[in-house]
């Protein structure tokens, strides 16, 4: 079972390097890792389990956050309309995106960052990604709003980018041009 002690924190080399492409079909170990990552997210969102094991709630996690430099991400959350996004993916890649941007009005957080980081993180308002799922099937997703932000955050992790790298250092609350907030 993955716990917070398994999650590496900012400054760890795996968080600043591009992760390796995962071979498909997935190995038994890669499938198990994906399942474990998914279970961590579910556990972190269950109040009783999270309290028992001192887990911070998360909606996404990437293998580099576990010190594993592979292009593997897991997502588990419901959007504002109650649609469940729950999946483990390998080799996710943004293949197209909008010019329009968006940002979370409350800012972003990260399981690998133990401190509050203030500022807006500009993201594409809409993205299309291609990936492979845990069953070795190709996946193509068109995302907008909060789901698009979550996926971009996790894809950044496999590319060695932390969310705070995208914040305007001179004016952290600068509203990016051509953007709209997401509550």
From Swiss-Prot:
Free-text remark on how the cofactor is bound: Binds 1 Fe(2+) ion.
Binding site for Fe cation: 110, 153, 157
Reactions mediated catalytically: N-terminal N-formyl-L-methionyl-[peptide] + H2O = N-terminal L-methionyl-[peptide] + formate
Keywords per UniProt: Hydrolase, Iron, Metal-binding, Protein biosynthesis
GO MF annotation: an example: metal ion binding
EC number annotated for this UniProt entry: 3.5.1.88
Top-level taxonomy: Bacteria, Bacillati, Bacillota, Bacilli, Bacillales
BP GO terms, sorted: co-translational protein modification; translation
Active-site residue list: 154
Similarity comment: family membership: Belongs to the polypeptide deformylase family.
Organism: Oceanobacillus iheyensis (strain DSM 14371 / CIP 107618 / JCM 11309 / KCTC 3954 / HTE831)
Name under which the protein is recorded: Peptide deformylase
Cofactor dependency: Fe(2+)
NCBIfam families per record: pept_deformyl (TIGR00079)
Biological role: Removes the formyl group from the N-terminal Met of newly synthesized proteins. Requires at least a dipeptide for an efficient rate of reaction. N-terminal L-methionine is a prerequisite for activity but the enzyme has broad specificity at other positions.
